[in-house]
A protein has these predicted regions:
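A conserved helix-loop-beta module that forms one wall/lid of the active-site cleft
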Residues: 73-88
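Active-site core segments that coordinate phosphate-bearing ligands/cofactors
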Residues: 1-46, 51, 56-74, 95-259
């Protein structure tokens, strides 16, 4: 098992089973968002290896659903939907979805994956050693690994990448920082001029030099960080000079700290 965080599907499902058993008993199949969207489009329920791995349900070593995890939590195997390849026909747009969305009925649904595997796909990141990075609500560094291994301290997540197969190991190792988007929001509310937009913040930040004239901001201010062994170290601002720095330096330093 290469994922063990409490904020992923398997652990959430275990919480529902223990705390809301009446709801749990109504479950037919478990789905990730991509599975649910495909179901609404086609009326069919299926999933992928990549999706199951993001939910913590995949046994990478044996290339199958993690029976040991299902047994540990007391999940029935019937909860797992039929598994389809990531790139394959996974259903077709039905009449209801076609009418509502203006799509052609019968259009094949041929791909699905989670947010970070999708981001890596869009950046042409497929092979061991290649890395994709993104900053939004959270900041993510997602690197492709060609071997089945793991971090014993659980500081990172491991997913089956979109091109992972039995014959070709391609695992996405994900490092996540919680405090990126909220840092930008905090700076807008508390540091930037009142009423400024995010685009105007970008313009203001561009007036500061690369490196923000020596200010550095570490965006660890949104709770515990798994990459730091679940420590809450808080955000820190370093190198601030009251005689030399202005709002534009701080805004740029926050953005540089995020990326």
């Amino acid at each position: 098992m290469l994922n063990s965080p409490g904020n992923f599907t398997a652990s959430k499902l275990a919480w529902i089973k223990e705390n809301e058993p009446a709801i749990y008993e109504q479950i037919d199949k478990i789905m990730l968002p991509g599975d649910y969207i495909a179901m609404k489009l086609s009326g069919e329920i299926c999933t992928t290896v990549s999706g199951l791995s993001e939910g913590m349900f995949w046994d990478f070593k044996n290339n199958r659903v993690a029976d040991f995890l299902m047994d540990y939590y007391g999940f029935d195997s019937s909860l797992i939907a039929d598994i389809k390849p990531t790139f394959a026909e996974q259903g077709r747009v039905n009449a209801i979805a076609a009418k509502e969305l203006g799509l052609k009925e019968g259009t094949p649904i041929t791909y699905r994956a989670g947010d970070q595997p999708n981001n890596a796909l869009s950046l042409n990141v497929f092979n061991p050693g290649e890395i994709a990075s993104t900053a939004g609500t959270s900041g993510v560094v997602y690197g492709v690994n060609g071997e089945v291994n793991y971090d014993p301290q659980s500081r990172v997540n491991t997913f089956a990448h979109v091109n992972h197969t039995i014959d070709q190991t391609r695992l996405g190792v994900l490092l996540c920082i919680n405090g990126t988007g909220i840092l930008n929001s905090w700076v807008k509310r508390n540091i930037a001029p009142e009423g400024i937009s995010y685009n105007e913040m970008n313009v203001l930040a561009s007036k500061a030099p690369i490196g923000s004239a020596g200010i550095s901001i570490l965006p660890f201010g949104n709770g515990a960080e798994r990459m730091l062994n679940n420590k809450e170290i808080g955000c820190s601002i370093r190198g601030l000079d009251f005689n030399a720095h202005g709002k534009h330096h701080i805004i740029r330093a926050a953005q540089e700290g995020i990326v």
